A protein has these predicted regions:
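Short acidic-glycine-tyrosine-enriched beta hairpin
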Residues: 63-78
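A cytosolic small-molecule/anion-sensing beta-strand core signal
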Residues: 53-54, 69-70, 88
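Structural motif
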Residues: 27, 56-58, 65, 81, ...
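Short, conserved beta-strand element in jelly-roll/cupin
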Residues: 32-34, 45-59
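A short, N-terminal "cap"/entry segment at the start of jelly-roll beta-barrel domains
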Residues: 1-25, 60
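Ligand-binding loop in jelly-roll beta-barrel domains
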Residues: 78-99
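Conserved short histidine dyad/triad with adjacent acidic residue
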Residues: 14, 29-44
Length: 99
């Protein structure tokens, strides 16, 4: 048993990730973003669910910015450009199903 927020820690000026599950059928990865850090626009071939464990983030999907807070989630559709930025430090779990 584990608390997800305890499995990945913040680092100043960095994005930290920890893969929890990596199978042919999908993956679960934890991320910790320091304030101001992010991931530049990219696409993925599969739908991905993002759930914020802590903090606040701006997630832009196909040019539309969304502001998420702790406890909120969004689905990033396959083959749609998206980016993430920490408006405050935040932790998230990214679940990608590859089926």
């Amino acid at each position: 048993m584990a608390k997800l927020t305890d499995l990945v820690g913040y680092q100043d000026g960095a994005v930290v990730s920890r893969e929890i599950i990596n199978q042919k059928s999908g993956s679960v990865t934890l991320f910790a973003f320091d304030e101001g850090q992010g991931l530049s626009e990219h696409m993925a071939p599969f739908d991905a669910l993002v759930y914020l464990l802590d903090g606040e983030a701006e997630i832009t999907i196909s040019g539309k910015p969304l502001h998420l807070k702790q406890g909120e989630m969004v689905i990033m559709p396959a083959n749609q450009p998206h980016s993430l930025k920490a408006t405050k430090r935040f932790k998230m779990v990214l679940t990608m199903i590859k089926a």
